């Protein structure tokens, strides 16, 4: 019995060692993402790893697939639109600031603007605010402000990562051609594009977070849910495999319509699939209802 147990232990150690070696080999190229420049052969290495992926777990394969997609993605693909930005005025006093943080903006970092949202002056970190709340002496919001960076919506995500590293900041304000604030992107947004959604203790579930299967022919979905996720549930293709124009169900609708459609607008994606806009504003699409003539492949909610 002892010999058998020793063999099992040795076998387990060998398996663990192989797994560790494999993971190191898999993720070593990803270190390049956090350097100031991505090597020219970065994606060729990733492609070779993906080709030889028989021993990889599903999560590992998904990360590699997302890495390859990341090459062509821009800030515009993942940014939080202007209409969804929560920010605080520079003139806010400490009592108002404390209340705003608790009630409206449950995040570790909060944008600060002077006058209008087109004049973002930086952001504050929650830990700096806590220190100020403790002392309450000579409070000046300006003293707490940290720097952000400016980026165009067309900037590649990999270039944004490198710039964030150089500038040592986690927040970028996206500026339109007229110099106005178009959106916001954080390093967390970029990492979610790579490894999937990252929930932390400040994230709160809402009706827009993911999707809900209402019945065998209806799904209510956040516009930011990826098309591939919904395709798996529906059992039908919503886009061609080589179509890189969009990744989310909202992107599909915007591509089909050419603009942000009004609530109640319906489009037929195929003979079996109809998409109806159930929530939107003039600048962004928030929620859609997907209706099928045939039943869903499998009914589940997220």
Curated annotation (Swiss-Prot):
Gene3D superfamilies: 3.30.465.10, CBS-domain (3.10.580.10). CDD domains: CBS_pair_CorC_HlyC_assoc. Residues 79-141, 144-201 form the CBS domain. The keyword Cell membrane does not apply. One of its GO terms (cellular component) is plasma membrane. GO terms for molecular function: flavin adenine dinucleotide binding. PROSITE patterns: CBS (PS51371). The keyword Ribonucleoprotein does not apply. SMART domains: CorC_HlyC. Keywords: CBS domain, Repeat. It comes from the Bacteria. It is not know if this bacteria is hemolytic. Belongs to the UPF0053 family. Hemolysin C subfamily. This is Possible hemolysin C. It comes from Rickettsia bellii (strain OSU 85-389). The lineage of its organism: Bacteria, Pseudomonadati, Pseudomonadota, Alphaproteobacteria, Rickettsiales.
């Amino acid at each position: 019995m002892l010999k058998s147990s020793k063999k099992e232990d040795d076998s387990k150690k060998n398996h663990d060692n192989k797994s560790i070696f494999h993971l190191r080999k898999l993720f070593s190229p990803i270190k390049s993402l956090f350097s100031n420049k991505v090597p020219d052969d970065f994606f060729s290495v990733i492609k070779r790893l993906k080709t030889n992926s028989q021993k990889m777990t599903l999560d590992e394969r998904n990360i590699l697939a997302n890495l390859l997609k990341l090459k062509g993605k821009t800030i515009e693909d993942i940014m939080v639109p202007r209409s969804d930005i929560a920010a605080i005025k520079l003139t806010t006093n400490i009592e108002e600031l404390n209340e705003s943080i608790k009630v409206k903006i449950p995040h570790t970092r909060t944008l600060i603007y002077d006058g209008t949202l087109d004049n973002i002056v930086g952001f504050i970190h929650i830990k700096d605010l806590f220190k100020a709340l403790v002392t309450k002496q000579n409070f000046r919001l300006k003293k707490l402000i940290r720097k952000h960076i400016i980026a165009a919506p067309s900037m590649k995500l990999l270039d944004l990562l490198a710039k964030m590293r150089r500038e040592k900041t986690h927040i970028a304000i996206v500026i339109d051609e007229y110099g106005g604030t178009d959106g916001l992107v954080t390093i967390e947004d970029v990492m979610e594009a790579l490894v999937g959604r990252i929930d932390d203790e400040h994230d709160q579930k809402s009706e827009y977070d993911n999707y809900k299967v209402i019945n065998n022919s209806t799904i209510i979905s956040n516009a930011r849910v990826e098309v591939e996720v919904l395709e798996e549930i529906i059992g039908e293709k919503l886009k061609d495999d080589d179509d890189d124009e969009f990744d989310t169900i909202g992107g599909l609708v915007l591509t089909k319509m050419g603009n942000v459609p009004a609530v109640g607008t319906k489009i037929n994606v195929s003979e079996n699939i109809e998409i109806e806009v159930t929530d939107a504003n003039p600048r962004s699409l928030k929620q859609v209802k997907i209706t099928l003539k045939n039943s869903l492949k499998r009914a589940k909610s997220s």
